[in-house]
Amino acid sequence: QGFMVTLDLLGESVQQAAEAEAACQAYVHILDRLAVEGLNYHVSVKLTQLGLAIDEGLACRHLGLICACAAKYHNFVRVDMEGSAFTEATLRVFRTVSAPRNVAGIVIQSYLYRSDKDVEELLKSGARIRLVKGAYDEPREIAYPRKRDVDRSFVRLMEMMLSSGIYHAIATHDERLIAAAQEYARAHDISPDDYEFQLLYGIRRHLQRDLLRQGARVRLYVPYGRQWYAYFMRRLAERPANLLFLLRNLFRA
């Protein structure tokens, strides 16, 4: 239908090295299988699924193996951002692995105060960024508590990214933020081919199709795997409003 795809094998915060190794091998298998099937689907990984909560070096090794496999197939790995307890370590591992920007990119959350500085540093290194609002329940000491401030931060970071000349991803279902990105791109002669929008598979399907018809590049984020229940309950516990968002937009789809 013209959509691009990113696959996310559900799972995070593993406590055993064997679990982290299994997750790494699962991603290598996914990349192998995608190549066999001729599918250019990207993959998204959480570093705590690869052992970050156990040992930073373990996560580095596993991410390096996955990136090497992706490079072999000219594929792409997106490193997800998790709770703020892992933000610095996630950035450190991403930089340590130092995969080329056509092989790996990272996620930045607009609700964190620190994100302006993080984006500035990442852009200097040429990193490809996926911008999200952020879904974890964080204290006001480190994150904007009000939606309007999160949105303002999102727009500010989005403009920095679009102006960089690097291919980035704008991940949101908020039509106002999508429109802001498109308006900024038009005003600054940035082609729709130079960035993409990312949306969850099955959520706001009419919006996804409308964006395609407008000539935008649209990638669907597809979580899958057996760990869905734990993932769902954890997200719900962290931010109950997530459930309302999901239900509201399922009906709007």
What are these regions (language model features)?
Residues 1-253:
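Positively charged, amphipathic and often flexible ligand-engagement surfaces
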